[in-house]
């Protein structure tokens, strides 16, 4: 599934890819799922031997054998990082003249998407993978600025999203417990994936 250069492949390369897919499907028959990490979008299935992570695959489908996702050895993971992509949006309101103006104090929405990015070696078809953790965008709202700046308000929203203190800062996030909870859950999922990779690389 991570192989994306089929259009430019030769007949021989396509045959090699099909043989690779067939061998991967056979490996699934011998893959023992020890645990699963994920909640909304993609799930990481991990095989362990004596409590040590050895292999994994990533899929969003419950019928994963039909998809035949690539089985990857943890020893072949060069790096694993969490990538939180944020899109900031100022919330505005209409004034008496019907113009859209900033609120006082200013209000913002911060849209978050969590991704895991891995560098992979010893695979002829891909050298990196990236998959999304949250199923839909996580939106946190903040009001007020830190030091009078937009970026400061966004930063405070992020801090509060993960439960960090913003004491003394003139900002707070609105009480959207479900979105704050989703943010924290996705952050913890990413931490567990990173830890599994570290444990498997040892």
Question: Whereabouts are the PLM-identified features?
Answer:
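A structural detector for beta-sheet-dominated domains
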Residues: 34, 47, 59, 75, ...
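Short connector loops at helix/strand junctions that flank enzyme active sites
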Residues: 53, 72, 111-113
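Generic detection of short hydrophobic beta-strand segments and adjacent strand-loop junctions
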Residues: 31, 35-37, 72, 129-131
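Intrinsic structural disorder
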Residues: 1-2, 77
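Short small/polar-residue motifs
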Residues: 39-43, 76-78, 102
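Short coil-to-beta-strand transition motifs
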Residues: 66-79
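Anionic N-terminal interaction surfaces
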Residues: 2-67
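Acidic, Ser/Thr- and proline-rich intrinsically disordered linker/docking segments
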Residues: 80-202
